[in-house]
Amino acid sequence: MSQPPLDELQWKSPEWIQSFGLRTDNVLDYFSQSPFFDKTSNNHVVKMQQQFSQQMPPAPQTARPKAAPSAERQAIWDRYPAYALLEQELAKLKGIEYVLAHVREPDFWVVRKQRRAGDRVTALNDYYIIGANVYQAPTAYSVVQNRLLSTGFHLSAALGAIQRLARFQPGQGAAFVPVEQNSVQPASGTTASSATAPALTAALDGATAGYSDVLTPEMMDRLMLQSLKSTPLYL
């Protein structure tokens, strides 16, 4: 059975959270259990080095990647030095890597997938973790495509409704069939102003009815035929 696209997938692991909890200092470990994580990424390489070689020194407070960080990333590194050390090790490698891009404790994180080539870093995807759920952020192309499809559908429905209401008569030309609108119950504060609304509506309906009685479609057709048969007089 084919797997759904990653941008349509929601993943969570209650068992993992029950065993280890979910906090900022282990959110990347939680993310690495999801199908969004690439097992060939540099994060996995660094993790294997930590587990088997045990050669990584303790994280010093001054350890920082070479690139100048943003204020938000600087705050993450200051509060969680392990992430500063992780990105220092990732900066030595080339390829796919995952970094913690945004933190809003206690239940929202953004993980960024990026490709590193020396000092050049290209963002590929963002993933957001809300509570225990992990999602892939949609691309700008997917968002625009969805909005255009929705706009086209509703525009087509509106044009179809307008076409069904359109009528054409030789004497009167194009017109639209009147549509009855459901009356809306006014609020209690507008009782005085709404009292005159039925009277005004009745007056307008009466005037429209009288006009339609005088100028019927048959009369308009006869007037048009008479105007066609008449001889124009030019001054």
From Swiss-Prot:
Protein location: Nucleus
Molecular function GO terms recorded: transcription coactivator activity
Keywords for this protein: Activator, Nucleus, Transcription, Transcription regulation
Record's keyword annotation contains S-adenosyl-L-methionine: no
Transmembrane segments: none
Key word Transcription present: yes
Pfam families xrefs: Med6 (PF04934)
Main location: nucleus
Superkingdom in the source lineage: Eukaryota
Protein family membership: Belongs to the Mediator complex subunit 6 family.
Entry function: Component of the Mediator complex, a coactivator involved in the regulated transcription of nearly all RNA polymerase II-dependent genes. Mediator functions as a bridge to convey information from gene-specific regulatory proteins to the basal RNA polymerase II transcription machinery. Mediator is recruited to promoters by direct interactions with regulatory proteins and serves as a scaffold for the assembly of a functional preinitiation complex with RNA polymerase II and the general transcription factors.
Name of protein: Mediator of RNA polymerase II transcription subunit 6
Gene name linked to the record: MED6
